[in-house]
Amino acid sequence: MANASTTKLLTCIVALEKADINDTVTISQNAASQPAVKLGLVAGNSYNMKDLLYGMMLESFNDCAYAIAEHVGGSTEGFAKLMNEKANEIGCFGTYFITPNGLDAENDISFHHSTAGDLCVIMSYCAWKSPKSTQFLEITQTMQYTFETEEGKMVFNNHNRLLTETDYCISGKTGFTTKAGYCYVAAVEKDGRRMCLSLLGCGWPNNKNYKWADAKSLVEYAVSDAAEDSYCDAACVTTQQTGDTQTTDKQATGKETPAVKKEDKKTINLKYIENNKKNKKICKNFLKNFTINIGNFF
């Protein structure tokens, strides 16, 4: 499904791996003309790659994402190829990206999309597995970033509320389009346990805070003692709920996957949680369509 600016997780890590963070980036008219949310880059002017990365990840500036993509990939099409190659390399076969900023798009092959499960894998790679994970975390954990441009002093503020509202979030990225709804992906750590959380379609205007309430509830549950004893289907859960009915990926495909066994909990403490009736006390704010994934990735 559409995943909005959570796309920028992959944009960031591909840029960090393929380019130097101190590169100078010249802005094209295409990048400068991107829609809000935007920094207001000026076509023909030059900016530091590091500053653009902070603008993209902290403030989610769309023009920064396009400028980065064109610099690294030669064009947005070339960069999309790099993104999709990386997605396939790390096992995200339900992901196909067209735009570096996550704005809804279609081409002759497909539409811009991912899954909650794939976004957890992408976040896991960004936070822990990439050779550039340290730089990625340094960027996404920064609460405020200041730099000087030809246009004057710029100040970026981090919009990832879970960095300050929980003790366990180490990275995250928000997103929104009218098609994707409010989205959020996060990396969580507690006592050596590493987990990722992904919410897609978690509310539409005027329910911007739904994702924060649900994400906090999921994080608190995931790091709790109760989660260690959970028996959950090890399946990527994409749930569409209308009234009292639900369907899941497993039901839709007819594929069964083994449950996580208690003796495996040292390596898989919690795989996935469905937002079904017994878990309503955990996640209660979702609207008609939602997707959640929580998982451990080592």
Where are these regions (language model features)?
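Active-site-adjacent loops and short helices of periplasmic peptidoglycan-processing enzymes
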Residues: 1-117, 127-129
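Domain-terminus/edge residues, biased toward the C-terminal soluble/receptor-binding domains
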Residues: 92-96, 108-298
